[in-house]
Amino acid sequence: PNLRNGVIEHMTLVPGGNKCYCGQYGCMDTYCSPETLLEDGESLSGFFSVLRQGEHDHRKRFDHWLANVAQAVSNIRALLAGDIIIGGEAARYLDSDDMDRLKSLIDEKSAFHDTRFTLRKSLCVEDQNIIGAALRFVQSYVTDVCNTEV
């Protein structure tokens, strides 16, 4: 009815925190975006490559980022107590140990400890936005040919 969708990435995670591109301060995006892991000139794949080699500074940045993501998920679950899918580019680089650790951090930060929810990564492939955008143009054709809904 209001012709808008939610923008959860602009919920305040840290009151008075980092300035966001939206003009507010402390938005989740300024703490949970994978770009917050990177230093000048560093790529996300490069960051995770160095992290997996055990470099201390990268581990420290990753631990801080993971704690922020856990707090954000805990806040979201306080309102919407459902399963969680971690998506976006960073999900491509998270391994099973990272996901187990994230679930543990979420539980630690939750008011009512409940590990019965499912936490998983989305299927993240290169150019997924392009593929997703194209789907609406071929959906009826695929449905007709495959005799199934896409």
Question: Each PLM stretch: what is its role?
Answer:
Residues P1-Y31:
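Glycine-rich phosphate-binding loop of actin/hexokinase-like ATP-binding domains
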Residues K19, M28-V150:
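ATP-binding/phosphotransfer module of carbohydrate and carboxylate kinases, centering on a glycine-rich
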